[in-house]
Amino acid sequence: MSGWRKIYYKLLNLPLKLLVKSKVIPADPVVELGLDPSRPILYVLPYNSQADLLTLRAKCLALGLPDPSQSFEFNGVELPSHVFINDGPRVFRYYVPKQKSVKLFHDYLDLHRANPDLDVQMVPVSVMFGRSPGREGHSQATPHLRLLNGIEKFFAVLWLGRDSFVRFSSPVSLRYMATEHGTDKTIAHKLARVARMHFSRQRLAAVGPRLPVRQELFNKLLDSKAIKKAVDDEARSKKISHEKAQQNAIALMEEIAADFSYEAVRLSDRVLSWTWNRLYQGINVHNAERVRQLAQDGHGIVYVPCHRSHMDYLLLSYVLYHQGLVPPHIAAGINLNFWPAGPIFRRLGAFFIRRTFKGNKLYSTIFREYLGELFARGYSVEYFMEGGRSRTGRLLEPKTGTLAMTIQAMLRGGTRPITLVPIYVGYEHVMEVGTYAKELRGAVKEKEGFMQMVRGLRKLRNLGQGYVNFGEPLPLTTYLNQHVPQWRDAIDPIEAQRPSWLTPTVQDISMDIMVRINNSAAANAMNLCSTALLASRQRSLTREQMQEQLDCYLQLLRQVPYHKDITVPKKTADELLEHALSMNKFEVEKDSIGDIIILPREQAVLMTYYRNNIQHLLVLPSLIASIVIHHRRITLAEVVRQIALIYPLLQSELFLHYSKEQLPGVLETLANELVQQQLLCSRDGELAINPPRIRTLQLLSAGVRETLQRYAITLSLLCANPEINRGTLEKESRNMAQRLSVLHGINAPEFFDKAVFSTLVATLRTEGYITDSAEAAQGDIVAIYNILGDLITPEVRLTIESASSSAEMEAESQAVEETTQE
């Protein structure tokens, strides 16, 4: 680099250091993209901009990557380490210098042809200042989406320097290009052309399509044939004028539609960045690259997260924005449309949805058409398939209405492929968890409002870590092609279609999405420590026992991972325990022997929420441990047989991904891991307990204890009264569970949750154990109950069976009474 250029860079660097604070995407490109800092890199930038180059240089030096401003020398040949695809405009538009990118690509390819050992990494990098997509109807493109001259760039850096990012893309091996495609000038031209297309798609993925003018959007919706027909029906059914019906339609659009504002997003990003840094010790994001690739490939993206907290709305938009993606339009419950939250959420992309559409055809038509318009325009959308926040920490049964509308939007004949992206959201502290416990105990849900929001904000402190894991995407077109090959026959651009295959397909997709959410779960210090302490009947463990138990969980999750998308802490058991203690949820008592970790009684109910977040990850090893402890010695084949009978119930309740065919192999691998940890012994083809490690094995088995007790309750009632109807079975099961929780100190609110028993009874019906005519397959029911009865304590079994007998006698006396009356 010449002396004059060094001086120029130093002078330009001074204001950039003050004005620019860029975020690197992905956060660690060396690890996430597989960049090799020891090998030479050719950085490819879209525009000729020294500000972009110096911004990139600062980030490269911080990441330990080669300096893009330094020349690359090899065998006496010196070439620049960066290339601009477009030389860019100048203040005087008529002066356009000759492009150098094709020549430089050709020089690099030539160098590879002459030197077989050389392998330069070509890395596309885009530097963006600001991400406003602009409004429809504005003819002038927004500055950062086109090539800027020097003056425009100066003002972009001045105004948007702290809203900028440096986006690294996956490297391309020039050795591979030279070997596979040759080194002539046509390949160099092709590289430049592909790079130009790459950057164009990347910009669109980062900023999204232009935002609509709200009134013009409403006018377009009113002109749609579906809404015109719904307005006519409204006027006729309510006997009002057409103008009044149209005013009703506009009022509903005002209630529903978002009013997205880039400036509001920028401002909220500043506020949230400040807030997260003070409330959270870190936000952990995994697998975001798969979503960035979908956006870049032109997919319409529907984000489908689990719903833990009202914080989800803000956290997900914040994470997506910082991953270089457009914040989505979010379907938010109408209960959040209160001042001042409602207007703020609306400006950040929220559109509001009522709890039910029943009895309001105009509302359902407008909502469906609005959602279809969002997809048609290319906006990403986010909705919570569970319908509401989980009060138990587990995934809820999915509500399928919005998903059905998503598929109906595809049936309008759009060309953009729509892909569902499941997201696992996890926290070490959920601010509403105390309220959830009260609601599960029967308290009335408090209505959202300004004062409740203020009270909630006062509780925000020491929230630990947050986790956002992007699961495996589900492309709807691919899914429908595989499962409903004739789906395109139902395409109609005007009328909303409800083909016969829609309802079962939507149900299957929704269950698949819930499974994929659980496949990307995040284990953390809080849910692992809660699992260990709640496994102890006294809710207390010595520090040594706690560390040993955490080690057991960590080894299981690392050696036999539930799924490739789950995340497991890299910290040791001791480090996780120290972090959990810093959250002030547990107490430590010291005596002459050592420390005792205690979960206070008032905290125990709340901690079940965090345990339930990851219960599905450990339920099978827990079940193996429980069976071996009861039998003392048992063959693996018998363990597999017993679990295979119980597994369908667990699979439905916890959205487990293993098929029945995969189950034996998975159980064998888990059993081998327990033997490896010396929790079990393997002798003469049998599994047996290892007495020195029995305490750890007992704590592991306790993870499934309450689940087995619940199953035993329902199956005991079925054994006692095979003709009991589904509604009564659910009600009696809940009543007995409440009784059991009082008599045996079961301190988990979800133990008698209505939704849990509803799912259980529905699964028994699906598996053929009961029918719609309220008949039970008695032999099968008794076989499963005998297995469950052996795995619960004699005291609990006695309580269940005596209560079942009482329920049976009551049912018989009621039947006799009804017969007498007849």
From Swiss-Prot:
Reaction(s) catalysed by this chain's protein: sn-glycerol 3-phosphate + an acyl-CoA = a 1-acyl-sn-glycero-3-phosphate + CoA
Taxonomic superkingdom: Bacteria
GO-annotated molecular function: glycerol-3-phosphate O-acyltransferase activity
Pathway in which this enzyme or protein is active: Phospholipid metabolism; CDP-diacylglycerol biosynthesis; CDP-diacylglycerol from sn-glycerol 3-phosphate: step 1/3
Taxonomic lineage: Bacteria, Pseudomonadati, Pseudomonadota, Gammaproteobacteria, Enterobacterales
Region entry Disordered, spans: 803-822
Comment, domains: The HXXXXD motif is essential for acyltransferase activity and may constitute the binding site for the phosphate moiety of the glycerol-3-phosphate.
Keyword Cytoplasm: no
Protein location: Cell inner membrane
Signal peptide: none
UniProt entry tagged with the keyword Cytoplasm: no
EC numbers: 2.3.1.15
GO annotations of cellular component type: plasma membrane
Keyword entries, A-Z: Acyltransferase, Cell inner membrane, Cell membrane, Lipid biosynthesis, Lipid metabolism, Membrane, Phospholipid biosynthesis, Phospholipid metabolism, Transferase
Span(s) of short sequence motif HXXXXD motif: 306-311
InterPro entries: GPAT/DHAPAT, GPAT/DHAPAT_C, GPAT/DHAPAT_LPLAT, GPAT_PlsB, Plipid/glycerol_acylTrfase
Transmembrane spans: none
Gene Ontology biological process terms in this record: CDP-diacylglycerol biosynthetic process; fatty acid metabolic process
Chief place where the protein resides: membrane
Protein name stated in the entry: Glycerol-3-phosphate acyltransferase
